[in-house]
Amino acid sequence: FDASAQDDEPLQGLDSETSLPTLAEKERWLQEVMEHPDCFTLVVEQAGNIVGLLESRVRELPRSNAHVLRFYVSLSAPVRRRGIGSELLARMIEWAHAQERIKKISLGVLSTNTPAISLYQRLGFVEEGRKKMEYHLPDGSFADEISMALFLRRKL
């Protein structure tokens, strides 16, 4: 599950299904992630192919958001709804609990992605708000972006 520089080229296989960046952008990103102590990244490989990615990082700017971990997760269609997403998120949440400064994990999810929303809710994430008509989908419809968060520690 741990990402390395060797995973960059296979990650291109996810591009047809996701909005991942170009190869050059991925190379810069992966190098930055590998060197950054406030990033947590997992790559899922199956039969020699990259089929999933979870990337998370602590917000550094503004400094008032330095307690927030934001993440992105992508799984190719054949491996969805098999527990892989749950495992990726569980590992990230476990890592986040060990990082004293992280108090909140946040994400944005399309309102049309009901399986992901259900998973996040099962893990304790709550809806914080919506950006109406944030995404224009290929079929011509629009989807909201739902902001969700998991609060790890509360100041008493």
Regions found by a protein language model. Give the residues of each.
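Conserved GNAT acetyl-CoA-binding A-motif
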Residues: 96-108
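A short, well-structured alpha-helix characteristic of acyl/acetyltransferase catalytic modules
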Residues: 1-17, 155-156
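Hydrophobic packing within well-folded, soluble alpha/beta domains
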Residues: 44, 88, 92, 105, ...
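Conserved active-site alpha-helix within GNAT-family acetyltransferase domains
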Residues: 82, 86-87, 98, 111-129
